Amino acid sequence: MEQRIKFPRSEKVYLSGKLFPEIRVGMRKVEQVPSTTFEGEKKVITPNPHVYIYDTSGPFSDPDIEIDLKKGLPRLREEWILNRGDVEQLPEISSEYGRMRRDDGSLDHLRFEHIALPYRAKAGRHITQMAYAKQGIVTPEMEYVAIRENMNCEELGIETHITPEFVRQEIAEGRAVLPANINHPEAEPMIIGRNFLVKINTNIGNSATTSSIDEEVEKAMWSCKWGGDTLMDLSTGENIHETREWIIRNCPVPVGTVPIYQALEKVNGKVEDLTWELYRDTLIEQCEQGVDYFTIHAGIRRHNVHLAEKRLCGIVSRGGSIMSKWCLVHDRESFLYEHFDDICDILAQYDVAVSLGDGLRPGSTHDANDEAQFAELDTMGELVVRAWEKNVQAFIEGPGHVPMHKIRENMERQIEKCHNAPFYTLGPLVTDIAPGYDHITSAIGAAQIGWLGTAMLCYVTPKEHLALPDKEDVRVGVITYKIAAHAADLAKGHPGAQVRDNALSKARYEFRWKDQFDLSLDPERAFSYFHAGRHTDGEYCTMCGPNFCAMRLSRDLKKTQKQK
């Protein structure tokens, strides 16, 4: 497995903090070649400025940092966490299941060896980023994300509203989430909120029939290379605990999970055997491994399950179907809803955020914006307030399959019912007729809802509805969603969002091919298509040829006008 991430003519650079000078925020600097023009017979060379690019590749792209997947990434945030004096290291793992896996000698060949004992909040201490923000405290993590969001706007003279204090205010008010489990110090701080860059999430994970630990770690690295801002491990197959440990220890972005999946695996797939006690132990197990946010389908209510019966496609969420069946079998309220305050008490001890899962999201455009979907959204609005009361950061998951004319209503209702908590949507897919191309059908909806205010977009791969995605599918899904997210950032007017577009457009106009490749979302793919055209670095491509290139003719026209 390749353990280095490389981009052509790019350099890993770091910007330092002002409040916390020890902070070093990594980003990618792309050097451009100079522009060449002629004034009469005189050749004029004009330098082009470097371009800074938001970078999710972490230490993997820094040639000065030694990478050893068996030891994990550097523990970037550990010193910041300990300096606050609010946490303690536990003498052993708290989870009964975690101890059982640790003591099982048959798993030694699968195990990540360098496991540190977990941290937890000291008694009576409030350690979440939201708790600090409410107290008026700007943490190193908050300054880190402010620098990261702005990149080199200051150098370029671009005004920006994003300061460490602005970050603090957004977190305190619940409008943004900074997912940062104290047991995942390897993660570089990032922020999810409508007043920041639109983020994308990548789903990976094994199933009962496919994939290995090595493959999932490779997918995680691959996602980070192409720009995945967060990563969800949705493993449902064997050795979920061990797979997750390897991923977290080698992941520079926040990691999320759906704990009910592992809980169901522990009872051999028998939904009726799920209990609060089992689920609670699973939460603690994953908190102490370092999961940064949990999708929890606590919005499923016993009295709302029947609303999905009217649908064309019923309930399509795995977590939603599990909890709906549990409610019906036991004829009672979901234990996730009944114990939501207890869940938040656990999460607050580790600073784990809650992503309120949309278990009743529509699985077809026919079912979009129906009574079942919006009944669950109402419950989410109640739950997000309860999470905030416990100082737990929270965001709201959304659809799904929604035709374009119904997208705006989703965003407006979510803002109204969920008190401006960040929205996190799966697409939405705007049509149902394109299996094999659902990364495109969903990116259309994702760009629109991102522009309207959704904070994070969950990627969709070409294999959606068809098969488990492989490494190449991850690449296509991430790039497709980076397009959607960036399109939304441009429409929102995010500070500095236009810089990269302008640089690439200028390079295109001047036929600086290498700069076009290097500034693109996927330099390798762009170069491969260009190279396949079998031509040199001339002032045209095989699309138009030398006589029909509009940009070449436009440049000639401009040159003629100057001479006159």
Curated annotation (Swiss-Prot):
* Molecular function GO terms recorded: 4 iron, 4 sulfur cluster binding; carbon-carbon lyase activity; zinc ion binding
Entry note: cofactor: Binds 1 [4Fe-4S] cluster per subunit. The cluster is coordinated with 3 cysteines and an exchangeable S-adenosyl-L-methionine.
Q: What is this protein called?
A: Phosphomethylpyrimidine synthase
Give the pathway.
Cofactor biosynthesis; thiamine diphosphate biosynthesis
Cofactor dependence = [4Fe-4S] cluster
Q: Which cysteines are joined by disulfide bonds?
A: none
Residue numbers binding substrate: 203, 232, 261, 297, 317-319, 358-361, 397, 424
Q: Which NCBIfam families match?
A: PRK09284.1, PRK13352.1, thiC
Stated role: Catalyzes the synthesis of the hydroxymethylpyrimidine phosphate (HMP-P) moiety of thiamine from aminoimidazole ribotide (AIR) in a radical S-adenosyl-L-methionine (SAM)-dependent reaction.
